[in-house]
Each structure stands twice: as structure tokens, then as C-alpha cells.
Amino acid sequence: MGSAKDKVAGKANELAGKAKKAAGDATDNNSLRAKGAAQEAKGGAQQAKGKLKDAVKGAVDKT
């Protein structure tokens, strides 16, 4: 996956995770809260992966 796709997918997962956590909070559903937190973390990791790809590409392009 390219860096832009990683960032977009990561942001989508992060937002979906936040929504699940909020729904879990509203319904007092611990399982939904946990799933939301996991999806939010996955999204953050995907975004970081995209940023890392950009940094590596930038470093390679400078050489």
C-alpha cells in the first residue's frame, strides 16, 4: 500500500474506532469500547506507517 493510502486508511480506521468507543460509552458496552480502542490504535499505526514511508522516500530521493 502506498503512503497516501496508508494515511487515508489509517484515518478512516481511527475515526471508526472513535465512533465505536463513543457508542460503547453511550451504551455502557465494554466490548464495543475495546473494539473501538483497538481499531483506533490500528488507524494510528497505519498513519505512522504512511508517514514513515514518506520519510524514507524523502531520504532516498535526497541521495
Swiss-Prot record:
Domain of life: Bacteria
Disordered: annotated segments: 1-63
Biased composition (Low complexity): 34-49
Species of origin: Rhizobium meliloti (strain 1021) (Ensifer meliloti)
Keyword NADP among UniProt keywords: no
Name of this chain's protein: UPF0337 protein RA1131
InterPro entries reported in the protein's UniProt record: CsbD (IPR008462), YjbJ_sf (IPR036629)
UniProt keyword list: Plasmid
Entry's family note: Belongs to the UPF0337 (CsbD) family.
Taxonomic placement: Bacteria, Pseudomonadati, Pseudomonadota, Alphaproteobacteria, Hyphomicrobiales
Pfam families: CsbD
UniProt keyword Nucleotide-binding, yes or no: no
Biased composition (Basic and acidic residues): 51-63
